Amino acid sequence: MPDQTQQFSFKVLTINIHKGFTAFNRRFILPELRDAVRTVSADIVCLQEVMGAHEVHPLHVENWPDTSHYEFLADTMWSDFAYGRNAVYPEGHHGNAVLSRYPIEHYENRDVSVDGAEKRGVLYCRIVPPMTGKAIHVMCVHLGLREAHRQAQLAMLAEWVNELPDGEPVLVAGDFNDWRQKANHPLKVQAGLDEIFTRAHGRPARTFPVQFPLLRLDRIYVKNASASAPTALPLRTWRHLSDHAPLSAEIHL
């Protein structure tokens, strides 16, 4: 009998949206950013630095949405979304968000902050596409600015990945702030995660600063999955929308 098993693929996008403002907070561009994100037609979107709420900005920022920023971005294109609050301040809070065309059956936000005021988190979502009925484990990541903090956070991330069911696909994407390129080795050795740009091109993609990318800060890792068409999206479209270049890829299960 012929093999009835069919490969399932989906498109992922990750981007640090800088709370919906241009560099140095000169201009609010969330509506333009939503339009750009929609053109990618990603099935799963991992967002960092998403404004969850703010009491002051709506009073003086033109085009400030009535909903949370992640709901505004999801709009009618992504039926499911999840938000993990990381940084909290008197006026509001921001964190990571995941938008999905497929049902998010469970999500939780884990605090990976290490000493001091720098608040960081990993947003986990268990996503189950109806056409497969099988779980995809997605983690949206924003790690710290200090190397020692990042190493501790990478260890926490690896431990969490290892707690997931054996053989099930894992996607880890986001802003790793890993300008010294020290994340790939521990994540591969400790958790079996492969960075897809490194697998395809020998090293992670340059993503920061978006005007002239030099640093390789943003990543897409997979486990129990393969990837194709890893792409740092064209700067001419995105350079005024974020300080990071977005990354996208096709993931195959």
From Swiss-Prot:
Q: What InterPro entries does UniProt report for this protein, alphabetically? A: Endo/exonu/phosph_ase_sf, Endo/exonuclease/phosphatase, GPI-anchor_lipid_remodeler
Q: Which GO terms describe its molecular function?
A: catalytic activity
Q: Which domain of life is it from?
A: Bacteria
GO CC aspect terms: membrane
Which Pfam families does this chain map to?
A: Exo_endo_phos
* Gene Ontology biological process terms, A to Z: GPI anchor biosynthetic process
Output the Gene3D superfamilies linked to this UniProt entry. Endonuclease/exonuclease/phosphatase
The record, for PANTHER family, names: CALCOFLUOR WHITE HYPERSENSITIVE PROTEIN PRECURSOR, ENDONUCLEASE_EXONUCLEASE_PHOSPHATASE DOMAIN-CONTAINING PROTEIN
- Identify this protein by name: Uncharacterized protein YbhP
What is the scientific name of the source organism? Escherichia coli O6:H1 (strain CFT073 / ATCC 700928 / UPEC)
Its taxonomic placement starts with: Bacteria, Pseudomonadati, Pseudomonadota, Gammaproteobacteria, Enterobacterales
By which gene is this protein encoded?
Answer: ybhP
